[in-house]
From Swiss-Prot:
Source species: Nitrobacter hamburgensis (strain DSM 10229 / NCIMB 13809 / X14)
Cofactor: binding details: Binds 1 Fe(2+) ion.
Co-factor(s): Fe(2+)
Record-linked Pfam families: Pep_deformylase (PF01327)
Family classification: Belongs to the polypeptide deformylase family.
Official protein name in the record: Peptide deformylase
Length: 175
């Protein structure tokens, strides 16, 4: 396993539409392991392949839960070729952040519930319903696979401001 570099806004790769994964290979399994290690190191709760410059339709997520003793129980999930089959008309709002837009958070409104189809690392296809933070996170990560960032869901003024800030920081870092 290896920690990979997370690409940061304004990197144009973040706007790429990721390619479907045809079959689960040992390379895809290693990529998934690297993605988990990278996500936990960051730390974050979700990571799309494109965020580590791998334009493949793969997502890792871990929405850990606290048990009765207050200990966090990891819940690692892999989604290969995920797609939203349906979304509720009801909306919910959560404050979102992104490992590719560090230290910037904004409230985003999304469908409160979604039905998702995806393939696991064993090549099995699943369908499941997601709600709450799980629905928000899966939508956020699937957006990445389609070249969409969470800032695309906020006002143009706020979006332009954050893009300008990160573009300026990238130029300063390049000097």
């Amino acid at each position: 396993m290896a920690i990979r570099e997370i690409i940061i806004l304004p990197d144009k790769q973040l706007r790429l539409v990721s390619r479907p994964i045809e079959t689960v290979t040992p390379e895809i399994r290693k990529l998934a392991d690297d993605m988990f290690e990278t996500m936990y190191d960051a730390p974050g709760i979700g990571l799309a392949g494109i965020q580590i410059a791998q334009p493949l339709r793969i997502i890792t997520m871990d929405l850990a839960r606290r048990d009765e003793e207050g200990e966090l129980t990891p819940r690692p999930r892999i989604f290969i070729n995920p797609e939203i089959l349906s979304a509720s008309e009801e909306l919910s709002t959560y404050e979102e952040g992104c490992l590719s837009i560090p230290e910037y958070y904004e409230e985003v409104e999304r469908p409160a519930r979604v039905r998702v189809r995806f393939t696991d690392l064993d090549g099995k296809v699943h369908e499941e319903d997601a709600e709450g933070i799980y629905a928000t996170c899966i939508q956020h990560e699937i957006d990445h696979l389609n070249g969409v960032l969470f800032v695309d869901h906020i006002s143009k003024l706020k979006r332009d401001r954050v893009v300008k800030k990160f573009t300026k920081a990238a130029k300063l870092a390049a000097k």
